[in-house]
Regions:
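Catalytic and substrate-binding clefts that recognize carbohydrates or anionic sugar/phosphate headgroups
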Residues: 1-154
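Conserved small/polar residues in nucleotide/adenosyl-binding loops
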Residues: 155-159
Length: 159
């Protein structure tokens, strides 16, 4: 299942090509801040976080923080926190397994257990965005569902 939430007046990015009805209630594992600029989710001891596209560090993003800000930095090393490209999608694999896509063209801040190892926090510059929660049987199912709702990449990779 894919659930869509909208906050404020989202900027239309055309990243999501399928229509979904808006849902009012977030899943129990997500807690939204009063100003709608951030949300948190508790992490289990063994939870792994995948995603954010071509970013720094290893496969498991847990324990670090990242900024989605599309910087054009020729020397993109592991000590950088700002992502080279904006892929605001990640999957939590653990006690709760789900994917989250933040459809927002401005800065998005991801704290994946950096400040508090047991909590992931996602923040946006302003409360004008769409949030998609993707639930499925497993990580691959969640990724497949997400790929079906986003626009085709302008680059076509050959097998």
């Amino acid at each position: 299942m894919i659930f869509k939430y909208a906050f404020g007046r989202p900027f239309k990015t055309d990243a999501v090509i399928k229509s979904f009805p808006l849902v009012n209630s977030l899943p129990d594992y997500i807690e939204m801040s009063q100003d709608k600029k951030s949300f948190t989710a508790k992490l289990g001891v063994d939870d792994i976080i995948y995603g954010l596209g071509e970013s720094v560090r290893g496969i498991n993003k847990r324990g670090f923080r990242y900024i989605s800000n599309c910087t054009d930095d020729f020397s993109h090393t592991e000590d950088k926190s700002s992502l080279y490209a904006a892929h605001n999608f990640f999957v939590v694999d653990g006690e709760e397994t789900y994917g989250i896509y933040v459809d927002f063209p401005g800065k998005v801040y991801f704290d994946f257990g950096y400040t508090d190892l047991d909590t992931l926090t996602v923040s946006v510059e302003e409360a004008n965005y769409e949030l998609y929660v993707v639930e499925g049987d497993n990580v691959m199912d969640i990724i497949k569902k997400f790929r079906e709702i986003i626009a085709v990449s302008y680059t076509h990779l050959r097998a």
